[in-house]
């Protein structure tokens, strides 16, 4: 059994498509997969990351908890809606209920690592500690990514949360000078597990499956579940 939290250096870096791609690659390797997104914002405009994962990767074990209409940080979205954030133990229980032998459970955060997900002030980093999970960090190839990535990795290390590697959530074709340079530099910071092509979320299920299988190292994926 393995629990892996999927965080990012910020909002809009591609966490959902990375969750879907890793889930797809794992399923193609014969691994049972569940995906959990405890907190979702922006539902009023149709945001539904779990449904997107299901559409792209064919995962049926999908679990969510709190949903807020406005596309804001969870605490702000909850306040705007006159609602509360979930409690820490609710999130931990949601994840624990999914975990079982032979299964890879992916837990997607909201925004970056230190965004408040539960009251009082509980972040995805705290949840990772609670469920003994490593963190896969989704990054960009854009200017500024090196600083954002290092800050995220330092925050993980401060609470002894292992980094399972980096994934570039949107790799341009062709890559420019900055993107190419940053990819090389990111690989010196931590292992880059994959670089997903820009626009991957628009692929149909068959093409997405092929892309996902090619993106990740098969041995690494197979080794995620012991």
Swiss-Prot record:
GO terms for biological process: biotin biosynthetic process. InterPro entries: DTB_synth_BioD, P-loop_NTPase. Its EC number is 6.3.3.3. Its main location: cytoplasm. ATP binds at residues 12-17, 49, 108-111, 169-170, 197-199. It is found in: Cytoplasm. Coiled coil: none annotated. Catalyzes a mechanistically unusual reaction, the ATP-dependent insertion of CO2 between the N7 and N8 nitrogen atoms of 7,8-diaminopelargonic acid (DAPA, also called 7,8-diammoniononanoate) to form a ureido ring. HAMAP family: BioD. This is ATP-dependent dethiobiotin synthetase BioD. It comes from Mycobacterium bovis (strain ATCC BAA-935 / AF2122/97).
């Amino acid at each position: 059994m393995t629990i892996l939290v999927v965080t990012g250096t910020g909002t809009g870096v591609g966490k959902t498509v990375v969750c879907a791609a890793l889930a797809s690659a794992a399923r193609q390797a014969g691994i049972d997969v569940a995906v959990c997104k405890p907190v979702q914002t922006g539902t009023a405009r149709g945001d539904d990351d779990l449904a997107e994962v299901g559409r792209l990767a064919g995962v049926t074990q999908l679990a969510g908890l709190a949903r807020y209409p406005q596309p804001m940080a969870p605490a702000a979205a909850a306040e705007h809606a006159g609602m509360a954030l979930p409690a820490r133990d609710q999130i931990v229980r949601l994840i624990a209920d999914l975990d079982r032998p032979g299964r890879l459970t992916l837990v997607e955060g909201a925004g970056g690592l230190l965004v408040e997900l539960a009251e009082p002030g509980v972040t995805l980093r705290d949840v990772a500690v609670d469920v003994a999970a490593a963190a896969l960090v989704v990054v960009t190839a854009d200017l500024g990514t090196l600083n954002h990535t290092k800050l995220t990795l330092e925050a993980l290390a401060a609470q002894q949360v292992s980094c399972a590697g980096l994934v570039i959530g949107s790799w341009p074709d062709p890559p420019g000078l900055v993107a190419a340079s940053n990819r090389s530099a990111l690989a010196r910071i931590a292992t880059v597990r994959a670089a997903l092509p820009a626009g991957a979320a628009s692929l149909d299920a068959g093409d997405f499956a092929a892309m996902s299988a090619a993106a990740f190292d098969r041995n690494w994926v197979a080794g995620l579940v012991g």
